[in-house]
Amino acid sequence: MVIDEHRLSSLDLRGCPNLKCVEVTNGGNLTSIQLDTCKKLETFNCCANFSIGSLDLLLMPNLKSLKCDYNKIESLDLSASQNLETLSCVSNSLTRLDLSNCKKLITINCKKCPLTSLDCSQLNLLTNIDFSECNQMEDFPKLPKGIKSITCERFPPIANADLSLFPDLTNLKAPYCELKAFDASKCRNLVSLNLWGNHIAALDLSGLNHLDYKSVDTPQKITLGAERIPNKSSLWRLYLPENVDLGKIYSYDYTDDVARRYYSLYTEYFTGDDGIQRPSFVANHLDLDNNLFVYNYKTNLFYEEEGKQKEILMDVYVAAKQVPSGVEDLAAEKTVKGVVYYDLQGHESAVPFSGFNIEVTQFTDGTSQSKKIIK
């Protein structure tokens, strides 16, 4: 039975004991579904009804697949769901989920639920789980050793997870998790890896011999502290994390067309007050409002394409944040040194061109700010 895009406020199917599949989806008024006598039911889909606050599953012992995404369910009693293999409860109001009797579960998707914890350690058949955006969960879930696929978008606690506990892990999706590092040595069997939008400055993927290069997503966004170099007031030093090897930076350039044409950028090791050499970028242009430049980092993982060996590169987009020096007042109003305009061909003028312009405001502290305008 399939009912989609309906206006039902309630549904009573107690007179249909032989039903094996029920799909009631996309209805904003439905508040109750009665399936008390549907003991043969194997598949139940009640996604996107939005008003359902509870489900009674106690008299459905043969249920194998339950999908109840996008409702208002606050609790889910699965004590009688011993045969459940697939559970999807995305975007509900669940704060806890007792899965202790669901020993046959293979796939769980509890994305966007306010769960405070999740224990799946006794679910030995579980291979796939998605707990993305479970923002109330402070600790990484307890998962079985045989888990193969983990999706945890916007889930910072993964930073403290020991992935070596899951030797069968082949797919990991952890975008936007605020990660500053990733230890690939703990998950050697990965085939697919998504670390998009984290804050990783250097990445070593050596040893991931099963990784499919077409299934690797690693663009990063980092913010570096910037400070004017003493006795070189026009130059800024941007401090890279110590684990960055400048020799592994394949290429780099400003993201702005005008900056690429008129400003310089280079890498340099410098010696700190403690005598230790550290990596940095040096620039004579600083834009504190946008991505300043991007660099491509070698990951030590190679693949063959069209008979040539290539290396997977990680794109890292860099923004700058001025570091207080104790001398300058960062809150003080900046003094404008001058304003210049550029057209699409890169021609410079003290006054705006007719049509599209890039306006570059230069300040006396060596920074600049650009914006697009139309005259």
Residue ranges and their predicted role:
Residues K321-H347:
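Residue-level detector of functionally pivotal "anchor" positions at catalytic/ligand-binding pockets or at interdomain
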